[in-house]
Structures are given as structure tokens and as C-alpha cells.
């Protein structure tokens, strides 16, 4: 009897020890992911998770510097147009080898109009990609081929020095052809979804959490310290903060703007604020009235927005007012600043009132407009402030409409908007990552800009190999975008996170990328 009791106690202690040994990282995510298909993902809620589950030809280190990914090395032809990627041994989380053919399959999906990727423009430097995406060529004419299972050959239209930077975006990730052909659209269901990254899907509870577990088949598995990552949906920033303070989260995706002062005073060592390549803006729907062919109205609304007051009193976290679209800090590029950026408040208001009248509106005949934003406390406060500024200065009647992430994205895609809150986070360190967003017909061009002159400038920049000349062309494009008031830049983002002291291995970076595979949990026992 005594031996049985001792054996039972030992087993219980072993079980308890095993449970304690599991290393779990609990992080919040802004919203429920709209899609876990790499070729269909559009926003940060998807990208954070996909970055944990997949890896492309190129990867990033903890500081978001480019490093080899599935491609352990690559060669570039003398003319800069042919890139040959040599793949390392890698496997899907079900153990099936990842091959060059998986990349060919994925990239063809990305530009196939029948698939409908909104990020197909990332592959436009590849031969025939744009023509295919526009429905004018067969997908098998795309300039990508598998010389063998370990060798991928990519043909570009022009030399593209920033091409490796494009390859960290999810749209370029490989996808498992053997699973997609078997499961069809259901391939992203938790029981079917596999990736080639550090973690694999274990559970997906909609509007609650996504649980990932370490993948033994990832080529760098020996360096991954976490056993499990849990992403919690956290659109309510105050609730997110409460969960963090209660010890239910190790890392927050954001913090409430109105709590910054308190957080600095009480959790200063755990509050991490850092500049990154991101722009908060309001987009006009340029496909229909009242903003189509009405630059005076667009300019009037832009002039009224008091960016300095917004970043001082509402966001209050060190954001910079934005008058151009490209963020400061992009290598080799000086962002464009319009003339009115140097005007005082009074001069801007006088000009805005004159333009508003010329556009046919007045306080007696006010503009009535809908402003769409995705559900988020911080977004709501900025939207309320902008609506009040428009009302006070011009008499504009604004209806605020908030929607959950997936519905919000759909309204933007379908141009079911008048004005909408937008944001763009740079995907690589080049001005092109901001400006090619608005090329005519582009999948992420949700303002509906159709400007041949703008498109021409982007095409010229793509062909220009001299860095200084190329930057000058891109600045002309940004100038055209801003001077035509096709959108309203408001501020440049900072990343804002609360991080528990025992979370190690991450590095502040301008991309705001935090792959879980570099994270360590170092709690005192």
C-alpha cells in the first residue's frame, strides 16, 4: 500500500513538472483574421499569425533584417533580371517536403484572377505577373519555374534591387498544393491547415483565440524555444489592457491611447513605444460622388484636419503628423511635404472654407458623408475628432460607421464607402512599398484611383536602376498623390506594446514584426 502511494505521488509530481515545463507565449491580436490563406490575407491580424506558420524564400531575423529563408542562397544574373534560388531541406508540418514546385504553385495562385488575391501586385516585378492578374495571359506564363525540386528560377521584367524585400510578404509564401487540391477552400480549416514555418495550427476558436504549437518539421526547430503560442482576439483595447494586468497576456498588440500617461507612470519598464513604417490615413472613394472629380472638396476636408492636435491630445504616444504618405526613415528617400504643411491653422481654415464653397457646399447646404472605420477604440476616437473638426469648420454632417474587420475590408474592396479609415504598414524598406498601393486596378487600391500619369511614374521608377534618379521619380509620384488630395494622411504610426519582463528575444524594429520563433520565456522558478 505504501509503495502504491509513493508511486502515485511520483507520477503526479512528474505530470505536474511536465505541465509546468510547457513554454507558452500569450499574445493579443487586433482582430479575428479574415483569412489564413497566404495568398488571400490582407491585414496585420492575418500577417502576424502567418509569419509564425509559414516562411518564404527570404526571412527576417528578430530585428526585421533580411536573412535567407527557405532559400539558403540565391544567384542574380549579370543583367539583374534572372534570380535563381537554391532551397534548403524543408518540410510542411505534415512531413511532406517543400519543393520549388510549391512556390511556383503559390505564385501562380497569387496572380490568378480566379483566386482574387489583393496583394498580387507584390509580384508585378515578375515577368507577365501584371498581365496575368489583369486577365490577359495564362497563369502558366508567369516568369517562375522549378528547374528541380531544390531550384527556383524567377524572371523579372527589370532589375529590381528591392526584390528580396518583397519576398517576406505572405502572398509570396509557398502553399501545400497536395492539401489544397484535396481540400479546396476548406484547406485553411484548423484540421487541414499546414504550413512550413516554426509553428502549426492546433486550435482556432473564432472571435476568441488561435492556438499554435511548435512544428518539429521546421528547418530551424532546434532554435525555437516556445512550445505553444496563443493569439487572443483583442479589438477592445481597454479589455486587452485589463487582461494584461491580470496576468492573462504576456504581450499586447496595442494599448489604449488615453492610458499612455498612466502606463508610463506605472508600467514604464513594460511599455515599449517605437517608430515604425506605418501611415494612418483617411481614404476617399474616388469612384463616385461626392469625391470623384472633386479635388476642391477633398482638399477642403484635408486642410481642416488638425493633425498636430490629434497626435498631441488623442493618440498622444509620440506619433508624427503626416502630410505625405511615405513615412520618414525609408532608406534613400526624402518624403514629399505639400506647401500647406507649413501654413498656420488660420490660413488652412480660410483656404478650406473657400474651397468648400467652390465645391458647392456651405453650412446651409452641408456635405453629408459616411466615415467608415474598423472596430477599435483608438480608431473611434480619431474618427470622432475628425468628424468634429469638419463640423466646426465647415458644417459637414458626418455619420460614423464602425464594422468588424472582415466586414470593413469587404466594404473597402467593394467601394461601399465614402470616406474610410485606412492604414498602410511598409512591407520592405523602400518608398515603393507605399506608392505602388495606388496603381490603377491594384488589389489594395481601395480608394479607386485611376491615374495614368501616376501609373507611368511608378513604371518609370521600376525601370530606373540609378538610386538617386529612381527616388526622384518616386517623389514625383507621391507629390501627385498628395497634391491631388486623393487621400488624407493624418499621422505616422508608432508601435505600442506592453511586454512582460520575462519575455525575451524580441527586438524593437521599424517593421513592427515580432515573430514568435525568436521569443523566449524566462520566468524565475
Predicted regions and their residues:
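Extracytoplasmic/peripheral linker and loop segments enriched in polar/acidic and small residues
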Residues: 311, 345-346, 396-413, 433-501, ...
Amino acid at each position: 500500500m505504501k509503495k502504491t502511494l509513493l508511486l502515485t505521488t511520483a507520477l503526479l509530481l512528474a505530470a505536474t513538472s511536465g505541465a509546468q515545463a510547457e513554454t507558452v507565449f500569450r499574445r493579443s491580436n487586433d482582430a479575428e483574421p479574415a483569412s489564413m490563406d497566404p495568398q488571400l490575407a490582407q491585414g496585420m491580424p492575418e500577417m502576424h499569425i502567418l509569419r509564425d506558420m509559414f516562411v518564404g524564400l527570404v526571412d527576417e531575423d528578430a530585428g526585421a533584417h533580411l536573412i535567407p529563408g527557405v532559400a539558403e542562397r540565391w544567384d542574380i544574373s549579370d543583367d539583374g533580371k534572372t534570380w535563381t534560388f537554391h532551397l534548403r531541406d524543408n518540410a510542411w508540418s505534415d512531413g511532406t517536403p517543400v519543393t520549388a514546385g510549391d512556390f511556383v504553385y503559390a505564385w501562380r495562385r497569387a496572380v490568378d484572377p480566379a483566386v482574387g488575391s489583393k496583394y498580387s501586385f507584390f509580384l508585378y516585378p515578375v515577368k507577365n505577373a501584371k498581365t496575368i492578374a489583369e486577365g490577359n495571359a495564362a497563369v502558366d506564363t508567369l516568369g517562375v519555374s522549378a528547374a528541380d525540386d531544390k531550384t527556383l528560377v524567377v524572371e523579372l521584367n527589370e532589375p529590381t534591387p528591392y526584390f528580396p524585400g518583397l519576398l517576406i510578404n505572405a502572398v509570396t509564401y509557398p502553399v501545400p498544393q497536395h492539401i489544397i487540391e484535396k481540400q479546396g477552400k476548406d484547406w485553411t480549416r484548423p484540421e487541414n491547415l499546414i504550413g512550413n514555418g516554426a509553428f502549426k495550427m492546433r486550435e482556432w476558436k473564432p472571435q476568441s483565440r488561435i492556438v499554435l504549437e511548435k512544428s518539429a518539421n521546421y528547418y530551424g526547430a532546434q532554435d525555437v524555444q516556445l512550445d505553444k503560442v496563443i493569439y487572443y482576439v483583442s479589438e477592445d483595447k481597454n479589455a486587452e489592457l485589463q487582461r494584461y494586468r491580470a496576468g492573462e497576456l504576456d504581450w499586447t498588440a496595442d494599448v489604449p491611447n488615453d492610458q499612455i500617461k498612466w502606463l508610463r507612470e506605472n508600467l514604464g519598464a513594460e511599455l515599449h513605444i517605437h517608430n515604425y513604417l506605418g501611415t494612418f490615413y483617411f481614404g476617399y472613394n474616388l469612384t463616385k460622388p461626392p469625391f470623384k472629380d472633386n479635388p476642391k472638396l477633398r482638399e477642403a476636408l484635408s486642410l481642416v484636419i488638425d493633425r498636430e492636435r490629434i497626435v498631441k491630445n488623442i493618440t498622444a504616444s509620440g506619433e508624427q503628423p503626416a502630410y505625405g504618405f511615405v513615412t520618414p526613415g525609408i532608406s534613400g528617400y526624402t518624403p514629399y511635404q505639400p506647401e500647406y504643411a507649413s501654413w498656420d491653422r488660420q490660413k488652412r481654415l480660410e483656404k478650406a472654407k473657400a474651397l468648400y464653397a467652390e465645391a458647392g457646399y456651405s453650412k446651409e447646404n452641408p456635405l453629408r458623408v459616411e466615415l467608415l472605420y474598423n472596430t477599435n477604440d483608438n480608431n473611434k476616437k480619431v474618427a470622432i475628432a475628425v468628424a468634429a473638426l469638419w463640423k466646426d469648420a465647415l458644417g459637414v454632417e458626418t455619420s460614423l460607421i464602425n464594422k468588424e474587420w472582415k466586414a470593413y475590408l469587404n466594404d473597402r474592396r467593394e467601394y461601399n464607402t465614402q470616406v474610410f479609415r485606412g492604414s498602410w504598414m511598409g512591407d520592405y524598406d523602400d518608398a515603393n512599398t507605399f506608392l505602388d498601393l495606388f496603381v490603377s486596378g491594384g488589389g489594395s487600391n481601395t480608394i479607386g484611383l485611376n491615374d495614368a500619369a501616376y501609373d507611368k511614374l511608378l513604371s518609370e521608377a521600376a525601370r530606373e536602376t540609378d538610386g538617386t534618379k529612381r527616388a526622384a521619380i518616386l517623389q514625383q509620384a507621391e507629390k501627385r498623390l498628395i497634391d491631388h488630395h486623393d487621400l488624407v494622411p493624418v499621422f505616422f504610426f508608432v508601435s505600442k506594446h506592453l511586454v512582460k519582463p520575462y519575455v525575451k528575444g524580441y527586438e524593437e524594429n521599424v517593421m513592427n514584426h515580432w515573430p514568435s520563433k525568436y521569443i523566449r520565456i524566462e520566468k524565475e522558478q
